[in-house]
Amino acid sequence: MSGGFYNVECPDCENEQTVFGKASTEVACAVCGTTLARPTGGEADLLGEVIETVEAR
């Protein structure tokens, strides 16, 4: 994974949310608040299932 954007599915409520691959802060699900991404100093640790990579326009 590089520093792109990913559509990640929340493991608790199945909400699909776009997350930056190198997030520097924790990213929570907008619906239920479950952590979807945790920063690691480089690429974020994506905790939900990656549905797809968002392509650049």
From Swiss-Prot:
The keyword Zinc applies. Coiled coil: none annotated. Keywords: Metal-binding, Ribonucleoprotein, Ribosomal protein, Zinc, Zinc-finger. It comes from the Archaea. Its cofactor is Zn(2+). The keyword Flavoprotein does not apply. One of its GO terms (biological process) is translation. One of its GO terms (molecular function) is zinc ion binding. GO terms for cellular component: ribonucleoprotein complex; ribosome. Zn(2+) binds at residues 10, 13, 29, 32. Binds 1 zinc ion per subunit. A zinc finger (C4-type) spans 10-32. InterPro entries: Ribosomal_eS27 (IPR000592), Ribosomal_eS27_Zn-bd_dom_sf (IPR023407), Ribosomal_zn-bd (IPR011332). Part of the 30S ribosomal subunit. Belongs to the eukaryotic ribosomal protein eS27 family. This is Small ribosomal subunit protein eS27. The gene is rps27e.
